[in-house]
């Protein structure tokens, strides 16, 4: 069984590199049972077992699961130095699974910003298929905490749509258009209110079309239109309703110095409606996510492929 050896070598790697924690992800709990087989003491063996090494180095064992039944079972065992974590959402790729586990562990103060961990993970949504060992510096994930907190307030369709928008924004921020950076805004959700607080700058290219943000052809069209003024309006379900919308700015909105009208509009629409706004900066491709008038996440897509790819 490959999973058994992945766990074994992951534990040994955690010891060898002096990691602060070993993190494993499990759906059904079977991987956790395999893990426990390495952590049992053998009083009759003269061999120094992995348990002795891990205990000596004070390596924390973190077991993360999106399954409530599995989480309750692991928690009820109350094993020393084993920290169970419940993850609300099932993620779509290995990097996102690990990021989610780290963010939850940070919020629970199991991990610290300067920690280094070894994570063992497998094919998403496929129980028992552990196949990957990763060494991760926790500080690289600290900035994603507020983004994950936002995700936790969304249902599955909203979360899926927002991820797709951020992915597309990252691509636009990296690639630009015809070798030049372009700036744009995406507004997701609370569509009726958003439309009432905006006005068209161009004829709507998506009128009469059932355009979806998950359609590669539609994403290509959005990239072509990304250099025009105004915002793309997208529903919670991912339907692209309009492009080139001028967003009204209402009330007092505070944004960091150096940000321009595009970011002010994004902050305002996210404050005055229940929408989430995502911007791409024309000055450098920086991607920012706005909610309730505040920046909850920002990243440079040229430096970070991020966990959505």
From Swiss-Prot:
Pfam families recorded: DAC, PK_C
Keywords: ATP-binding, Manganese, Nucleotide-binding, Nucleotidyltransferase, Transferase
Lineage: superkingdom: Archaea
Reaction equations catalysed: 2 ATP = 3',3'-c-di-AMP + 2 diphosphate
EC number: 2.7.7.85
Chain ranges of the DAC domain: 144-301
GO molecular function, one term: manganese ion binding
Cofactor: Mn(2+)
Matches recorded under InterPro entries: DAC_DacZ (IPR014499), DisA (IPR050338), DNA_integrity_DisA_N_sf (IPR036888), DNA_integrity_scan_DisA_N (IPR003390), Pyrv_Knase_C (IPR015795), Pyrv_Knase_C_sf (IPR036918)
SUPFAM superfamilies assigned to the protein according to its UniProt record, in alphabetical order: PK C-terminal domain-like, YojJ-like
Known role: Diadenylate cyclase that catalyzes the condensation of 2 ATP molecules into cyclic di-AMP (c-di-AMP). c-di-AMP is a second messenger for intracellular signal transduction involved in the control of important regulatory processes such as osmoregulation.
UniProt record similarity statement: Belongs to the adenylate cyclase family. DacZ subfamily.
Name the UniProt record assigns to this protein: Diadenylate cyclase
Species whose genome carries this gene: Methanocaldococcus jannaschii (strain ATCC 43067 / DSM 2661 / JAL-1 / JCM 10045 / NBRC 100440) (Methanococcus jannaschii)
């Amino acid at each position: 069984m490959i999973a058994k050896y992945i766990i074994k070598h992951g534990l040994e790697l955690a010891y060898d590199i002096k990691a602060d924690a070993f993190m494993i992800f499990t759906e059904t709990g079977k991987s956790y049972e395999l893990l426990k087989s390495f952590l049992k003491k053998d009083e009759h063996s003269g061999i120094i077992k992995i348990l002795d090494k891990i205990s000596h180095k004070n390596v924390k064992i973190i077991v993360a699961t999106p399954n409530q039944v599995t989480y309750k079972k692991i928690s009820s065992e109350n094993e020393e130095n084993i920290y169970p974590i419940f993850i609300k959402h099932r993620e779509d790729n290995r990097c996102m699974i690990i990021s989610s586990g780290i963010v939850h562990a940070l919020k629970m103060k199991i991990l610290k910003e300067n920690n280094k961990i070894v994570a063992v993970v497998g094919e998403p949504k496929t129980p028992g298929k552990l196949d990957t060992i990763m060494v991760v510096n926790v500080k690289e994930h600290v900035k994603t905490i507020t983004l994950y907190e936002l995700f936790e307030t969304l249902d599955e369709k909203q979360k899926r749509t927002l991820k797709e928008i951020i992915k597309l924004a990252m691509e636009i921020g990296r690639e630009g258009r015809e070798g030049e950076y372009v700036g744009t805004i995406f507004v997701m959700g609370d569509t009726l209110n958003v439309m009432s607080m905006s006005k068209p700058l161009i004829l709507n290219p998506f009128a009469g079309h059932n355009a979806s943000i998950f359609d590669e052809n539609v994403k290509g069209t959005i990239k072509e239109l990304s250099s025009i003024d105004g915002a793309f309006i997208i529903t919670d379900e991912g339907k692209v309703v309009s492009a080139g919308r001028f967003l009204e700015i209402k009330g007092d909105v505070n944004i960091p110095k150096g940000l321009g009208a595009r970011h002010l509009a994004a902050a305002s629409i996210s404050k005055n409606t229940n929408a989430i706004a995502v911007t791409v900066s024309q000055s450098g491709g920086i991607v920012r996510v706005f909610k309730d008038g505040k920046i909850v996440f920002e990243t440079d897509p040229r430096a970070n492929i991020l966990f959505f790819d």
